[in-house]
Amino acid sequence: MVRVRFAPSPTGPLHIGGARSALFNWLFARRYGGKFIVRIEDTDLERSSRQSEENILAALRWLGLDWDEGVDAGGPCEPYRQTERLHLYRHYAEILLQSGAAYRCYCTEEELAAEREALMEKGETPRYLGRCRDLTPQERARLEAEGRKAAVRFRVPRDRVIQVKDLVRGDVSFECNGMGDFIIMKSDGIPTYNFAVVVDDHTMAISHVIRAEEHLPNTPRQILLYQALGWDTPEFAHVSLILGKDRSKMSKRHGATAVEQYREKGYLPEAVVNFLALLGWSPGGENEVLSIEELKQQFSLEKVSKSPAVFDLDKLNWLNGYYIRQSSLERVAELAVPFLEKAGYIRAPLSPEEFERVKMMVASVRKYLNCMEEVIDHVKIYFTDNFNNLDEDAREVMAGQQVPAVLAALKDKVASGGKLTGAAARAALKEVGKELGVKGQQIFMPVRVAVSGNTHGPDLDQIMAILGKDEVVKRLSRWV
């Protein structure tokens, strides 16, 4: 059975790269009827926090990536936090010590730093040279008598080449001689990443390890550990790095890096998932708008590219705008409410009448939205009538010779009429145009500027209907 995992370290929010890895694992499990497991790698005791863990899990839920086993879900391989599995790592470290595949190392940080510096001065790759590799029992006893605490190092075999058969990158070779014996258990009894991940992936029966390319150099060490413990290795698939549009490593200057930042800006989860899926994977063909169901049916590692993926914020904005326009008006209006409240335009909870007005506003502007945060600026015209700083185009429109007459006639027409609906607004504009012998831009543009302060925006009849009779009369009166 396919069993894959996403194993974040709870040292901060869920970043775009981690979310992409989680999504690829989730899609792979769903495509092949497997299990998706969420494991928390919290052995960095100083930087890990339960709050970060909760934030990561919340981000996964928001994206719709449900897990079959793991934290908050339980399962046959509990526990799913590394700090609750320390007994397992110590058990398997002892097995490696007993077999001679590992040994205790008493070197101090100062000794190791001096060794690294000496190698670098010679132009060699820093690595452990094996000072404690073949200590006699007497030498170990002497070092322990000095009060030195021992770490556990894996004994890397000499003159061997490790072949990694990667489902994305093909065959990759690593020379053991340049590796150096590496620590698997620190002197405080905490496992290192490479050791803990091997024990966890084996005991959780992980079949495929799908992760970022930056983990590829760790893979030969992990394969050596699998072999030393007599375990089968899982399949490996290392997906490409994510770069900015300038082809440099993705950073904050290319856009927000944490998933929760996109949620806070009002991106829709289905748009973010669609976008993430296309970072290094392609379904083939020209269609790039794919639902969750379509992604589950089409995803495969064969179509994951070796080349770096490019994070294109413009593409995400386009996708998100598409999903905003495809969503129900009710949903988009509900998404808009927190932003309008934040701007001070409304105060929740809304009455049914107030929510209907929000729906009308959102309907008038959603074709312009790339993310819901932008609704604040686009509906501003409905909440402010401070048009003192008109742009040059608007001032030019209002300098027209017939503008005062047009606005005065429309003000009287609206004031004497009934409720100002969209249809009533269109009728009033048509009648004024006919009476004064003006049409098209000659009437629509000055009215638009008078009621909204802009020469562009939502349909004029929508603006007038949303503002309502009294507000339209008030705004027109300022120009008469």
Swiss-Prot record:
Motif ('KMSKS' region): 249-253
Organism: Pelotomaculum thermopropionicum (strain DSM 13744 / JCM 10971 / SI)
Subunit structure: Monomer.
GO biological process, one term: glutamyl-tRNA aminoacylation
Positions bound to ATP: 252
Main location class: cytoplasm
Protein name from the UniProt record: Glutamate--tRNA ligase
Motif residue range(s): 'HIGH' region: 8-18
Required cofactor(s): Zn(2+)
CDD domains given in the database record: GluRS_core
One Gene Ontology molecular-function label: tRNA binding
Function per UniProt: Catalyzes the attachment of glutamate to tRNA(Glu) in a two-step reaction: glutamate is first activated by ATP to form Glu-AMP and then transferred to the acceptor end of tRNA(Glu).
Localization per record: Cytoplasm
Pfam families referenced in this protein's UniProt entry, alphabetically: Anticodon_2, tRNA-synt_1c
SUPFAM superfamilies associated with the record: An anticodon-binding domain of class I aminoacyl-tRNA synthetases (SSF48163), Nucleotidylyl transferase (SSF52374)
Gene this chain is encoded by: gltX
PROSITE patterns: AA_TRNA_LIGASE_I
Matching InterPro entries: aa-tRNA-synth_I_cd-bd, aa-tRNA-synth_I_codon-bd_sub2, aa-tRNA-synth_I_CS, aa_tRNA-synth_I_cd-bd_sf, Glu-tRNA-ligase_bac/mito, Glu/Gln-tRNA-synth, Glu/Gln-tRNA-synth_Ib_cat-dom, GluQ/Sye
Keywords for the protein's UniProt record, in alphabetical order: Aminoacyl-tRNA synthetase, ATP-binding, Cytoplasm, Ligase, Metal-binding, Nucleotide-binding, Protein biosynthesis, Zinc
Textual note on the cofactor: Binds 1 zinc ion per subunit.
EC number: 6.1.1.17
UniProt: Zn(2+) binding residues: 105, 107, 132, 134
Catalytic activity from the UniProt record: tRNA(Glu) + L-glutamate + ATP = L-glutamyl-tRNA(Glu) + AMP + diphosphate
